[in-house]
């Protein structure tokens, strides 16, 4: 008979259960013990069994595995198109998001396709970080039986263009896998390359894969993949909405111009969740277009008809609505230098590092101003890239605001040789769009930045500057749900008096005890600069206690500096208070990421 603990004890285990637990955990490292503690707490909080049942896809793996690693949705849409192509060719395929892929099964893959974007300065998209780290670790297996192909999406205005695709391609080859097709590195205008690549992949696989049975085809097409939420409006077919409110939420003295925008979605049926982003199709500044045309001896030719996306438009309208004018790239600099034959520009092009820095710091119009020449409309358009929408983290919950969507916009303002310049999208939203004006928008769903399913789960939110936006949505949702879980916000900006975004709302949440803790970092209010990562370290013991209680951690904001510094702070906290070395702490954080307890929305 099992001996039960006395009724007065607080121990919820019998002596026999306790003995079994001690036996099972006696040889575990501090990292393993800490992970198990948080793992089972999270399972209890979510109301899920400790060991999930095997998935249907795992039980009957398809010959073709297609992994989508997306940051802004482009890679996911392209992967869905390829999935549909393969199904139409009666080939058996499983499409899976990188964040859901059980990467330790990669050695069993025979045919592997990866479509991936790159974020920031060459980093993998958030949902692919765990897979990326695994493949580049000592644990990665040899892959002699795997054939693969990689399509990499990127933005050539960044130095490490399409780096994640390049990294996946080279690493898979190093591990012994064989290329089905040469890697493709595609810029923002990737559609033509993608169509060619998709067709080539399908043709190659037809000779390698048996035709799928009707049941297999139905399984592949029935949504046994992680589809994004359906929406009546898309990037390609956006909603025409109206601006309801535009309000500056920094003070007159602030060096930052941050706007709170409310957009009316009445009768549109457009739905979103906290964690999603709003895509905005902006228009270029007419004054900037006039300046550029004048420098290129095209003044007075704004009405000249030009072909754009299957239609004919006046040149000025084409530049306003269809071409990127505010972000320069090394390719544009090189192309213009070849037209201009300017010695100074050609010298810049000859130096790769100097070229990258010049493109980053010099808008197109200011490059032209350095060496103005006469160009035809055709030559000008041949240099430019298509305009792409900007994404903004949504700052509202529909449970609170109904048929509206709110965003927080940091307006980009600077000077070049004394001439004021603004960001393309932020300037459009702040300066050229009036209340009740129309704008084209769509929802970019982000299943990799979601509140816990269990309202009892505590959350830690780290978002300096405009990175605070999604956490406004989070707390609106938690309030509407009556969620009892604790909430802790880390926020930072230069000055308390000038830059405390949504201050009154946070104060109300603190007063009403919805916001359990708030830790603030004002970088310019004292001699020593203080940032959110410093507050995380200062509160390390409490942060670790929350993590041990199953807290989910969310980070939003700048990918290149803040997010890296915050991650280093979290690793330091885990190492110190979890009694681990830095490598173990980093692995522990990776496990949290896999469990969806550490999520980032960085840009």
Swiss-Prot record:
GO BP of this protein: cysteine biosynthetic process; hydrogen sulfide biosynthetic process; sulfate assimilation
Protein's organism: Sodalis glossinidius (strain morsitans)
Subunit organization: Alpha(8)-beta(8). The alpha component is a flavoprotein, the beta component is a hemoprotein.
Domain FAD-binding FR-type: 236-452
Domain Flavodoxin-like: 64-202
Gene3D superfamilies, sorted: 3.40.50.360, NADPH-cytochrome p450 Reductase, Chain A, domain 3, Nucleotide-binding domain of ferredoxin-NADP reductase (FNR) module, Translation factors
Record NCBIfam families: cysJ (TIGR01931), PRK10953.1 (NF008197)
Protein residues bound to FAD: 326, 360, 390-393, 408-410, 414, 423-426, 603
Reaction(s) catalysed by this chain's protein: hydrogen sulfide + 3 NADP(+) + 3 H2O = sulfite + 3 NADPH + 4 H(+)
Cofactor dependence: FAD; FMN
Function of the protein: Component of the sulfite reductase complex that catalyzes the 6-electron reduction of sulfite to sulfide. This is one of several activities required for the biosynthesis of L-cysteine from sulfate. The flavoprotein component catalyzes the electron flow from NADPH -> FAD -> FMN to the hemoprotein component.
Keywords (A to Z) from UniProt: Amino-acid biosynthesis, Cysteine biosynthesis, Electron transport, FAD, Flavoprotein, FMN, NADP, Oxidoreductase, Transport
CDD domains (UniProt xref): SiR
Known EC number: 1.8.1.2
Pathway linked to the protein: Sulfur metabolism; hydrogen sulfide biosynthesis; hydrogen sulfide from sulfite (NADPH route): step 1/1
Entry's cofactor comment: Binds 1 FAD per subunit. Binds 1 FMN per subunit.
Residues holding NADP(+): 523-524, 529-533, 565
Molecular function terms, GO-annotated: flavin adenine dinucleotide binding; FMN binding; sulfite reductase (NADPH) activity
Family membership: Belongs to the NADPH-dependent sulphite reductase flavoprotein subunit CysJ family.
PANTHER family with a match to the protein in the record: NADPH OXIDOREDUCTASE A, NITRIC OXIDE SYNTHASE-RELATED
Residues annotated as binding FMN: 70-75, 117-120, 153-162
Assigned GO CC terms: cytosol
UniProt name for this protein: Sulfite reductase [NADPH] flavoprotein alpha-component
InterPro entries per record: CysJ, CysJ-like_FAD-binding, CysJ_Proteobact, FAD-bd_FR_type, Flavdoxin-like, Flavodoxin/NO_synth, Flavoprot_Pyr_Nucl_cyt_Rdtase, Flavoprotein-like_sf
């Amino acid at each position: 008979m099992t001996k039960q603990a006395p009724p007065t004890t607080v121990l919820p285990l019998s002596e026999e259960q306790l003995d079994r637990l001690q036996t099972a955990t006696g040889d575990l490292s501090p990292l393993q013990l800490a992970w198990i503690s948080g793992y089972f707490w999270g399972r209890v909080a979510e109301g899920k069994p400790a060991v999930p049942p095997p998935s249907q896809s795992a039980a009957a793996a398809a010959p073709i595995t297609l992994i989508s690693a997306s940051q802004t949705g482009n890679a996911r849409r392209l992967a869905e198109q390829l999935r549909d192509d393969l199904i139409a060719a009666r080939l058996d395929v499983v499409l899976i998001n990188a964040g859901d892929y059980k990467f330790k099964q990669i050695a069993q893959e025979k045919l592997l396709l990866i479509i991936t974007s790159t974020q920031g300065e060459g980093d993998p998209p958030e949902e692919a970080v765990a897979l990326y780290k695994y493949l580049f670790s000592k644990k990665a297996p040899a892959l002699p039986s795997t054939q693969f192909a990689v399509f990499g999406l990127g933005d050539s205005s960044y130095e490490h263009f399409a780096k994640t695709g390049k990294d996946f391609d080279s690493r898979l080859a190093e591990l012994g896998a064989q290329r089905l097709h040469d890697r493709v590195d595609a810029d923002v205008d990737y559609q033509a390359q993608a169509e060619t690549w998709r067709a080539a992949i399908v043709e190659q696989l037809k000779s390698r894969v048996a035709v799928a049975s009707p049941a297999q085809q139905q399984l592949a097409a029935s949504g046994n993949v992680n589809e994004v939420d359906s929406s009546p409006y898309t990037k390609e077919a956006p909603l025409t909405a109206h601006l309801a409110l535009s309000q500056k939420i920094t003070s007159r003295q602030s060096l930052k111009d941050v706007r709170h925008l409310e957009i009316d979605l009445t009768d549109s049926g457009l739905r979103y969740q906290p964690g999603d982003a709003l895509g905005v199709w902006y228009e270029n500044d007419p004054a900037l277009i006039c300046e550029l045309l004048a420098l290129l001896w095209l003044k007075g030719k704004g009405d000249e008809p030009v072909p754009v996306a299957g239609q004919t438009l006046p040149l000025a309208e084409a530049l306003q609505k269809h071409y990127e004018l505010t972000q320069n790239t090394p390719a544009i600099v090189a192309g213009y230098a070849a037209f201009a034959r300017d010695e100074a520009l050609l010298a810049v092009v000859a130096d790769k590092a100097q070229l990258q820095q010049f493109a980053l710091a010099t808008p197109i119009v200011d490059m032209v101003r350095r060496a103005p020449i006469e160009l035809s409309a055709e030559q000008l358009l041949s240099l430019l890239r298509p305009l792409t929408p900007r994404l903004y983290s949504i700052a509202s919950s529909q449970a609170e605001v109904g048929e509206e969507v709110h965003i927080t916009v940091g307006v980009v303002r600077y000077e070049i040789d004394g001439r004021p310049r603004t960001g393309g999208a932020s300037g459009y939203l702040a300066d050229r769009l009036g209340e009740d004006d129309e704008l084209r928008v769509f929802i970019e769903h982000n299943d990799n930045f979601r509140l816990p399913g269990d309202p009892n789960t505590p959350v830690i939110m780290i978002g300096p500057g405009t990175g605070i936006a999604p956490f406004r949505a989070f707390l609106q949702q938690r309030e509407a749900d009556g969620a009892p879980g604790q909430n802790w916000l880390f926020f930072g900006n230069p000055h308390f008096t000038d830059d405390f975004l949504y201050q009154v709302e946070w104060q109300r949440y603190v007063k009403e005890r919805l916001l359990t803790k708030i830790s603030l970092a004002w970088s310019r209010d004292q001699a020593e600069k203080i940032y959110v990562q410093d507050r995380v370290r200062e509160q390390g013991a409490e942060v670790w206690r929350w993590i041990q209680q199953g807290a989910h951690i969310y980070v939003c904001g700048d990918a290149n500096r803040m997010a890296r510094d915050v991650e280093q702070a979290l690793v330091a906290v885990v190492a110190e208070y979890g009694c681990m070395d830095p490598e173990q702490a980093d692995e522990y954080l990776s496990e949290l990421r896999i469990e969806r307890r550490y999520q980032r929305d960085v840009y």
